Amino acid sequence: MEIGNKLRSRRTELGLSRIELAEQIHVTASSISNYENGISYPKPDTLIALILALKIDANYLYQDYLTN
């Protein structure tokens, strides 16, 4: 599963809208959409904020890349 799909899946699992997540990590909702759709990738500080807000492990996001 791609990183963007994992972000979307976890966000919806937590019942968060893109706007709510964006407000929590201080980015725009369109940025969240871009991350989820693989259009762009978050900067390191934003990635850390996403990991904390979504309560996920960084290894979960990158496990497909680490095992290949």
Name each model-derived stretch.
Residues 26, 45-60:
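DNA major-groove recognition helix of helix-turn-helix/homeodomain DNA-binding modules
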Residues 26-42:
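Recognition helix of helix-turn-helix/homeodomain-like DNA-binding domains
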Residues 5-24, 49:
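Short basic helix-loop element that most often maps to the first helix and adjoining turn
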Residues 1-2, 66:
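A detector for short, charged/polar N-terminal pre-domain segments
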Residues 9-10, 34, 60-68:
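Short, charged recognition helix plus adjacent turn
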Residues 2, 7-8, 30-33, 55:
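Compositionally biased, low-complexity segments enriched in small residues
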Residues 1, 15, 41-44:
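Non-catalytic, surface-exposed connector residues within folded enzymatic/regulatory domains
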